[in-house]
């Protein structure tokens, strides 16, 4: 129950602009993926592959450059290799691993789906405190528990879970001073 309360508390601190930004965050990401690549799936796959520990603006820039040049670069080496495989024609779902990355991919491909991307910010929001680099790993059990908390909170707030995650992410970034 505490997870739901923490998520709801962050949502309640959202400005109108942050709510609007969050509501349209994944549809905008979908449009970016469609614009930078031959298919939305390929674009979303490269964006998702490069996403771990990557600021959003840099992530988009690197994905855009990767498709323009045919060469992925700039991220963690294993993630760059996954992005390159997708650029070279691999199915993103055959390449991408981990609940966070695969869900992020799915949310970009289908911004109105039911997946919740539980990244380090979503985790911190749910537990009610910033962990920096000291947070425990997000294994399958924790991922499922936190995803369920976002789904339940979203039901109470009248928004889709993917929208709630994006809205709270937008608020959290402002509150912790991340652009």
Predicted regions and their residues:
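HhH-family (HhH-GPD) DNA N-glycosylase catalytic core used in base-excision repair
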Residues: 1-179
């Amino acid at each position: 129950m505490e997870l739901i309360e923490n998520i709801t508390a962050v949502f309640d601190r959202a400005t109108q602009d942050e709510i609007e930004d969050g509501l349209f965050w994944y549809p905008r990401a979908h449009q970016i993926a469609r614009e930078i690549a031959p298919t939305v799936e390929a674009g979303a796959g490269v964006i998702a592959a490069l996403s771990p520990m990557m600021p959003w603006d840099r992530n988009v820039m690197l994905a855009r450059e990767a498709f323009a040049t045919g060469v992925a670069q700039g991220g963690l080496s294993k993630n760059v290799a996954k992005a390159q495989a997708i650029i070279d024609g691999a199915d993103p779902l055959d390449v991408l691993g981990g609940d966070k990355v695969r869900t992020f991919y799915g949310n970009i491909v289908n911004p109105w789906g039911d997946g919740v991307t539980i990244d380090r910010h979503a985790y911190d929001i749910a537990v009610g405190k910033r962990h920096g680099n000291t947070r425990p790993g997000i294994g399958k059990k924790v991922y499922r528990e936190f995803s369920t908390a976002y789904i339940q909170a979203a039901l109470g707030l009248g928004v889709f879970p993917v929208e709630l995650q994006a809205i709270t992410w937008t608020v959290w970034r402002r509150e912790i001073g991340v652009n």
